[in-house]
Regions:
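Short, flexible loop/hinge motifs at secondary-structure junctions
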Residues: 1-185, 253-254, 498-502, 516-525
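Mobile genetic element proteins and their domesticated derivatives, centered on retroelements
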Residues: 46, 122, 159, 194, ...
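Gly/Pro-rich turn-and-neighbor structural signature
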Residues: 103-104, 114-119, 123, 205-303, ...
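Short helix/loop capping segments that flank catalytic or ligand/cofactor-binding pockets
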Residues: 131-133, 167-171, 261-263, 283-286, ...
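Conserved beta-strand -> loop -> alpha-helix junction used to position metal-binding or nucleic-acid-contacting
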Residues: 251, 312, 321-354
Length: 525
């Protein structure tokens, strides 16, 4: 009897221990879900003062997009979610009216208003009144774009003397300028408009189709897509030159995201990558791959031997291993993990975010400094902060359960510690990877409107044309103006002088031409 009772007791103790273990697992899972829910709510409904910064929001968008891309597209519209509760906020005072001097670069059309002969007669004596001055007022007007048919007439010439003698009249036809699309009817301005609308303004081609139809001209989205591919073929030598220049950078920042590609019966999660060059090689170059394997960045970064600034994606290990590449980490990623887990360990989160805030404050102070001055400032101020943070990370790691959400933030930071500290030994390395993440956010916006690419050629086209429009944005260049001139000239441009069409060099040359003519440079962006 006693033996049976002891066996039952041991069995109950074992069951209690199993239940306790299960309760701990559920507790940690509950904390994780609370973190995710708080993250989504803050992203969606957070008050303006508490919402994520632009760079943090970009990272959240990328994380969400990769999860959402795997979900099926619903056949019916999803009912809108219930509106959040509103709270009183300080009303922002509207900015004053912009001075007309800000619009001096616009062309001027003058409308003159005069009195008729009858109105000029003086009502008192009937004598004609003389003009004594004017009153002026200004308006900013929008003149909708329009299509024109451009007729190219090539005159033919023949030798009348040879023709009279019965010989070959030696006919010569005047040369016509090369076109971006051989035997195509789309002019360079129209092609530039389509590329700018899709890759700089994120308009899907079906919307452009509707816009063109309202203006009295039908261009199907299929035709536009073919034209975009043709433009990419024309500018690919320039794209390759920009990629070559990026690989010459001292620091290359990179990031990637999903770019769905149509496949048989489903969409395939292909990838688009961005590689941001430094100030000496100021180009944002995109690349398209069929998957997220390391072969993509490894191929693009061939011959690169400097510093690669990236997130913690393990595929980059294969890029730097065996190569003379230094890998740098992103402190914005680390900070975001502490912010996400704030609800589960608020004291730790506040302490970590406070220290990281001081770290970023040093960067703000060093923003306009030279590379040498920035490095000295980091050595004086950032290194002690990092030493203090590391001590606290090790202490928190001992305090937290391994699966605690805050432990994930602590372990992530410690595992990336060497990469996260590279910026303290090189003043040219940024503290975060926000510059490439901002470019990925724009890819996400374009993907939201266009959903997918049709095939590998479409992905390659997207990468090439996004490279041009993104680099134009970086240099505050009007992509419509730049692309129009590029497509007019590049087909017949000598390959040895290709650098003249790099966006930064084109901008300087364009400004110099305008100055030589004594006219203001056209607006950039």
């Amino acid at each position: 009897m006693m033996r049976t009772l002891l066996a039952e007791r041991d069995s109950e103790r074992q069951r209690v221990e199993e239940l306790r273990k299960r309760a701990d697992e559920l507790y940690l899972e509950n904390l994780r879900l609370q973190v995710e829910l708080a993250r989504y709510k803050k992203w969606t409904y957070g008050p303006r003062a508490d919402r994520l910064s632009e760079n943090e929001l970009a990272q959240v968008l990328l994380d969400f997009a990769e999860e959402l891309e795997q979900l099926p597209i619903p056949s019916e519209e999803v009912p809108p979610a219930s509106e959040p509760e509103y709270e009183l906020r300080r009303v922002r005072r509207r900015k004053g009216r912009r001075a007309l001097a800000n619009f001096e670069n616009l062309p001027v059309s003058t409308h003159v208003y005069e009195l008729s002969a009858e109105e000029r007669a003086c009502p008192c004596c009937g004598v004609e009144r003389q003009e004594i001055g004017t009153e002026e007022s200004w308006q900013i007007e929008y003149i909708p774009g329009h299509f024109e048919r451009i007729r190219h007439v090539r005159k033919k010439y023949a030798c009348p003397s040879c023709e009279r003698a019965g010989e070959n009249p030696r006919i010569e036809v005047a040369a016509k300028a090369d076109t971006a699309i051989e035997k195509g009817f789309a002019g360079p301005g129209l092609l530039a408009y389509i590329v700018t609308s899709k890759f700089a303004d994120y308009l899907p081609l079906y919307r452009l189709e509707d816009i063109f139809e309202r203006q009295g001209f039908e261009i199907s989205r299929a035709t536009q897509s073919v034209w975009c591919g043709d433009v990419a073929d024309v500018v690919e030598p320039l794209y390759q030159r920009m990629a070559e220049r990026v690989r010459q950078s001292h620091v290359v920042a990179t990031d990637d995201t999903v770019l769905p590609m149509l496949s048989v019966g489903h969409t395939q999660p292909a990838r688009i990558w961005v590689y941001v060059g430094d100030q000496e090689n100021p180009y944002n170059v995109f690349d398209f791959t069929l998957d997220r394997g390391r072969e993509g960045p490894k191929h693009f970064l061939r011959d690169f031997t400097q510093t690669l600034l990236a997130d913690a994606y393990g595929g980059y290990n294969g890029v730097v291993t065996g190569n003379a590449i230094t890998r740098a980490g992103c402190w914005s990623h680390a900070r975001r993990k502490f912010v996400d887990a704030e609800k589960t360990a608020p004291e730790i989160a506040r302490e970590a975010v406070s220290l990281l805030g001081k770290l970023f404050a040093v960067e703000k102070q060093a923003k306009e400094a030279s590379v040498e001055e920035r490095l000295q400032l980091r050595q004086r101020q950032s290194v002690p902060l990092l030493a203090e943070l590391r001590q606290k990370l090790l202490r928190w790691k001992e305090q937290l359960l391994p699966k605690h959400p805050m432990a994930e933030a602590v372990n992530y930071t410690l595992s990336q510690w060497a990469e996260l500290n590279v910026f303290c030994s090189d003043g040219a390395v940024p503290i975060d990877n926000n510059v490439s993440e901002r470019e990925m956010k724009r890819v996400v916006l374009n993907r939201k409107n266009s959903l997918f690419v049709g095939n590998p050629r479409g992905g390659r086209t997207a990468a090439i044309l996004a490279t041009l429009t993104s680099t134009c944005r970086r240099h505050e260049i009007d992509p419509q103006l730049y692309l129009t001139q590029l497509l007019v000239n590049l087909p017949s441009w000598p390959a040895r002088d290709l650098d003249a069409w790099l966006p930064d060099q084109w901008k300087r040359a364009h400004a110099a031409r305008c100055a030589a003519l004594g006219i203001p440079a056209p607006p950039t962006t």
